Amino acid sequence: MKKLAVLLAFLVTNGSQVSAFDTADLKKFKDTNYCRKCDLSNADLVNGYLKGADLNGANLNSANLKGANLKGANLKHTKLHFAFLWYADLEGATLQGANLKGAKLDFAFLWYADLEEAYLRNADLEGAYLEGVNLKGAYLGFANLNGATLQYADLESANLNSANLNNANLNSANLKGANLKGAVLCNTIMPDGLVIDRGC
């Protein structure tokens, strides 16, 4: 009986940690496209038209934004842990200091987006389009960038420790001061246009 009580307490506690979005915040956002520092965790925003949205400092942990249009959106300092952003359009979006740990950004469009000092540990960016993106000082440790396009990307002082850069295109990218320790560079196009095979 005691064990059952402990188990129930555990489930209740963990259930509260996976709490859903605030319904009032979601309504406000849908009505105004503005929701700074609000709670939209676990919200279903699949294919949403959110162009130019202001979500500065919002909680979007585990939110489903697959295919969403977030062009030019303000996502500074947002929490996007394990958020689903497959095929999302984030062209020109601002994600400075955003926490994208474990986020799913497969084949997302991030042309000229600003991710300066963003946290992308274990993020999945397979096949993502990152031309001209600002990743200065960003943390990309253990991130999956297999097949990602990073032409003209600014990765100055970025941390790519143990990142997967297989088949990635870094042609004309800025890697000044970047940490590539342990990164997998197999069939990877480097800034000078040469193809490198390291860790294959």
Region annotations inferred by a language model:
Residues 4-13:
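Sec-dependent N-terminal signal peptides
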Residues 16-20:
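Sec/Tat signal peptide C-region and signal peptidase I cleavage site
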Residues 21-200:
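Tandem repeat scaffolds
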